Regions:
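Reductase modules of NAD(P)H-dependent flavoproteins
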Residues: 1-7, 142, 147-187
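Ferredoxin-reductase
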Residues: 2-88, 175-176
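A structural signal for isolated positions on well-ordered beta-strands in alpha/beta enzyme cores
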Residues: 66, 91, 112, 140-142, ...
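Acidic/glycine-rich phosphate/pyrophosphate-binding loops and surrounding catalytic core
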Residues: 91, 107-110, 124
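Conserved S-adenosyl-L-methionine
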Residues: 108, 132-139
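Histidine-anchored nucleotide/phosphate-binding helix
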Residues: 122-132
Length: 187
């Protein structure tokens, strides 16, 4: 039986955070994935399908699918994705990939999650599942960015801090600005 590798998704929302950061929420019928995994997102540009891997930001039970992007200066795909409007089509691989998932982590009490920029996405996917909270005593999320404007999803993080105040710890690093409550520098 032939199974299509790509499925057509529709843009449900395009959130422009800064000139270079944006989030796409996409409605697409894909196979079940594990929190922390990635899939490929693609557009047909000048007759060529250009695809790149992106981590899911949403948990497996949340819809629409959510991806966090940085527009690369020379990036054909990211510079086309940022221009998409609600209802526009995008290609999504039906099957997710990757071993950046909880069941690949050896037994331990605490987990540290370190992400730079959009690299926070797979952690937010994992943190929005019950399994991580049942498994670890302490969960530390570190996000490193260049500027305050790059610190996105702070409301999600604040909700986790309120809900799991004795279990969850968050620390931001900002390299190009001195911001109160953050460490100045890189990780």
């Amino acid at each position: 039986i032939f199974m299509p590798q790509w499925v057509e998704g529709k843009i449900a929302e395009n959130i422009h955070w800064t000139d270079n950061l944006f989030t796409l929420k996409i409605d697409a019928d894909i196979d079940k994935f594990a929190a922390g995994q990635f899939t490929s997102v693609a557009l047909d540009i000048d007759g060529v399908r250009i695809a790149r891997p992106y981590s899911f930001l949403n948990s497996p039970d949340q819809r629409p699918l959510e991806f966090f992007f940085y527009t690369a200066i020379e990036g054909k795909l990211s510079n086309a994705l940022v221009k998409l409007k609600v209802g526009d089509s995008v290609w999504i691989k039906k099957q997710a990939n990757g071993f950046f998932v909880l069941n690949e982590i050896p037994p331990c009490k605490d987990i540290w999650m370190l992400g730079t920029g959009t690299g926070i996405a797979p952690y937010l996917s994992i943190l929005n599942t019950p399994a991580v909270w049942e498994r670890f005593e302490k969960i530390v999320l570190i996000q490193a960015v260049r500027t305050r404007a790059d610190l996105r999803y702070q409301e999600v993080i604040a909700n986790l801090e309120n809900q799991f105040e004795d279990q969850f710890f968050f620390q931001a690093f900002v390299s190009r600005e001195n911001i109160e409550g953050t460490f100045h520098g890189r990780i």
